[in-house]
């Protein structure tokens, strides 16, 4: 049900920590914002719902973006937001909205998931994905896929139609075939842009540029972010979604092609429940993007939930605190999260993150840069 605009609000600038990240926290809630993410739900006929997505965090700067390309990114994010909204507005379940949006992003060559997946060192594409139901705490994840068109669909089947949580490689694709999931020729994932990114990454490995001191760097050039590397520009693109449906259930999903030039079957945080994806109706739903190794080591997605459940922190406080832990050990990235009351946050410590949200008013909001 569409909430009355006079009673619905979007709070911005809640908490110094949120402001420090350059990204305010917001809420879809119709009533007063909760001070803690674990406070009892208030009875409300308005039944707020909300949907938040991301298309990856990384070195995303206006100076490198053409107007045409920026429009393409914004249009696809808007389309994905409306896909999730249509499910939630008619009273659909949270995970249907998550899958609807992520499938659209997986089918787009713009994002590092599905069709737009980056290449491994061997010149192949290896896809990872995960999904979690906050109501039941059931979860499904897949990794190392080479022929599954939409990994998020298979992750959900692992959750709902198998006794397992995670499947990988050939075994996962056998399961996909048995369940009727669409398989494609590996050539489907090829895009010239991603191929050229691989070539540049390999060349950078062979001929790394010399490090410059602060004195050698022009004043007009900003210093690199902590934890940044030469290949940061190839890391963004992971996609994810989190939502709160009208029944008060939370859900989260994430999908990625990993990192350009990865080797040896490397798997990042995206398919790791508790690191890249997590959902619990008692606290929040989270989807992450960034340096996967660091997000795994700090168990980002679950840590946010734990800080809320055991430490009494609000969603934005927990999200900021956890991302600070990532930065402290050298990691970069971002995340989206939403709690049981409709409060949500989208912090990141990179120069940009593709992100957006939509609520009962059906108005899609899309942001890319830090400012």
Feature names for model-found ranges:
Residues 1-18:
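N-terminal secretory signal peptides and thylakoid transit peptides that target proteins
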Residues 13-15, 19, 31-371:
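Alpha/propeptide regions of enzymes that mature by internal proteolysis
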Residues 27-29:
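Boundary at the C-terminal end of the N-terminal hydrophobic targeting segment
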């Amino acid at each position: 049900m569409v909430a009355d605009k006079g009673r619905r609000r979007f709070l911005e600038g809640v908490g110094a920590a949120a402001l420090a990240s350059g990204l305010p926290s917001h809420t879809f809630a119709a009533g007063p914002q909760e001070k803690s993410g674990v406070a009892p739900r208030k009875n409300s006929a308005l039944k707020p719902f909300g949907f938040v997505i991301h298309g990856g965090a990384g070195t995303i700067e206006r100076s490198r973006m053409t107007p045409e390309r920026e429009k393409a990114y914004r249009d696809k994010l808007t389309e994905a937001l409306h896909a999730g909204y249509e499910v939630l507005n008619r009273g659909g379940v949270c995970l249907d909205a998550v899958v609807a949006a992520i499938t659209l992003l997986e089918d787009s060559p713009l994002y590092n998931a599905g069709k737009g997946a980056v290449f491994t060192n061997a010149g192949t594409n290896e896809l990872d994905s995960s999904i979690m139901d906050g109501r039941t705490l059931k979860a499904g994840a897949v990794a190392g896929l080479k022929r599954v068109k939409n990994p998020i669909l298979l992750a959900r089947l692992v959750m709902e139609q198998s006794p397992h949580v995670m499947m990988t490689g050939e075994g996962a694709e056998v399961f996909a075939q048995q369940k009727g999931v669409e398989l494609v020729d590996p050539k489907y994932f090829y895009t010239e842009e991603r191929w050229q990114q691989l070539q540049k990454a390999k060349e950078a490995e062979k001929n790394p540029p010399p490090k410059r001191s602060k004195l050698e760097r022009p004043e007009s050039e900003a210093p690199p972010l902590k934890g940044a590397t030469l290949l940061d520009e190839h890391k963004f693109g992971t996609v994810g979604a989190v939502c709160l449906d009208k029944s008060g259930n939370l859900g989260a999903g994430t999908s990625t092609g990993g990192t350009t030039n990865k080797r040896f079957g490397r798997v990042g945080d995206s398919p790791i429940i508790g690191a890249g994806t997590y959902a619990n109706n008692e606290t929040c739903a989270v989807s992450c993007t960034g340096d996967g190794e660091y997000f795994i080591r700090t168990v980002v997605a679950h840590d946010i939930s734990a800080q809320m459940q055991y430490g009494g922190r609000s969603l934005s406080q927990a999200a900021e605190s956890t991302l600070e832990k990532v930065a402290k050990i050298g990691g970069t990235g971002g995340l989206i999260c939403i709690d049981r009351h409709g409060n949500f946050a989208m912090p990141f410590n990179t120069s940009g993150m593709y992100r957006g949200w939509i609520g009962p008013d059906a108005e899609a909001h899309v942001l890319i840069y830090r400012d």
